[in-house]
Amino acid sequence: MGKYFGTDGVRGVANSELTAELAYRLGRAGGYVLSKHLPEGEQPKVLIGRDTRISGHMLEGALIAGLLSIGAEVMRLGVISTPGVAYLTKSLDATAGVMISASHNPVADNGIKFFGSDGFKLDDATEQEIEDILDAAEDTLPRPTGKDLGFVSDYYEGAQKYLQMLKQTVEEDFDGLHIALDCAHGATSGLAARLFADLEANVSTIGNSPNGLNINEGVGSTHPEHLAEFVREKGADMGLAFDGDGDRLIAIDENGDIVDGDKIMYICGKYLSEKGRLKDNTIVATVMSNLGFHKAVEEAGMTALQTAVGDRYVVEEMKKHQYTLGGEQSGHLIFLDHSTTGDGMLSGVQLAEIVKSTGRKLSELAAEMPVYPQKLVNIRVTNKNDAMNGERVLATIQEAEAEMAGNGRILVRASGTEPLVRVMAEAPTAEECDRYVEKIAQVVREDYGVDG
């Protein structure tokens, strides 16, 4: 991670850390770096999408100004999901795509995330190149004039093109399925209900009334309990909860129980494997995936690989070997045959197709994967790097691992986007999880916690 770019683009409190001035400079630097390979005289084409945050308009305007000042043609997509921007960037042969969103973070935050012409997130080297320009003492980038300046146009029909692609990834409609949706008052608000209705599902929706301030507020994939209640109330066959920018999915079964990313990966992986469509019978997951996921995958004759936390690392591993399925427990799921990044709506239609074509309830499909009790605690710290390397912290982790003797695991890591240290434990019982997590968390709090 660099000075500006975290694990998922540039993020911060809008108009305080992520200012209009920084967005303008990112437009210039990003536009230049991503278009310098173009033949001389060819104008770069950049797509811009955003979620429903009130600060999106301000940052979009500033970002566009920066791109225009470098001579780029800008196509505004309006409110659309992150994977929608990634797909359209590739399918429209654009030079780059940019999404303005802070995903599942609170409304005060926002972020700017770039995609290359192939629809994939930028690699570390490209991000570093952009950072070097931002840090330069002087802006020496080209400043075209007259006819060489950039221009902007609206391409709101891009969303329809994206939905069309999603519909073509399934072979049958969802007639007879009652699907409840939670759009987190975010980027999928104008899209998800239309997608599932077009596929003949009976659709009920919550979290579908964005007002610029309510994104992720008590709704969406980070608050699935709201949708769980709604599924029970409506008697739906399943529920699908997206996050603010639509790149995650957490599902709810017909009983109102949560089906997380691990279970969705297992269900989809097993189905694809049986159909002969899972490359090397392999699923790419992260170190956060539950031990139960690994046991179920193995039992079904598949292999699970592990990467660092972050969908970008999952995608890197998938690209290297052309694996078809990967994801995270948090609900980022990547179907590389159809998409270049995590896609909540794509994951939703794949899961609904499995429920429809197998004729089995989602609860039955999910029950095949056992879940080891897991506890995760986030601790706000003064310096996450110091906390991760603290002598007492490391000693306490070693102590806990020795106690476990292989029957469970501990994972302590720094958040890629916030000043947090995450302490996670899995063990045979919930009581043991609590004990291990609290033991480590207490030391982190005492030595590095914001509140001491």
UniProtKB/Swiss-Prot annotation:
InterPro entries xrefs: A-D-PHexomutase_a/b/a-I (IPR005844), A-D-PHexomutase_a/b/a-I/II/III (IPR016055), A-D-PHexomutase_a/b/a-II (IPR005845), A-D-PHexomutase_a/b/a-III (IPR005846), A-D-PHexomutase_C (IPR005843), A-D-PHexomutase_C_sf (IPR036900), A-D-PHexomutase_CS (IPR016066), Alpha-D-phosphohexomutase_SF (IPR005841)
Entries under Gene3D superfamilies matching the protein: Alpha-D-Glucose-1,6-Bisphosphate, subunit A, domain 3, Alpha-D-phosphohexomutase, C-terminal domain
Listed EC numbers: 5.4.2.10
Taxonomic superkingdom: Bacteria
Biological-process GO terms, alphabetical: carbohydrate metabolic process; peptidoglycan biosynthetic process; UDP-N-acetylglucosamine biosynthetic process
Keyword Phosphoprotein (UniProt): yes
Residues where Mg(2+) binds: 103, 243, 245, 247
The protein's enzyme class: isomerase
Swiss-Prot/TrEMBL cofactor(s): Mg(2+)
Modification type Phosphoserine: residues: 103
Cofactor note: Binds 1 Mg(2+) ion per subunit.
Family: Belongs to the phosphohexose mutase family.
Protein name: Phosphoglucosamine mutase
Gene, per the UniProt record: glmM
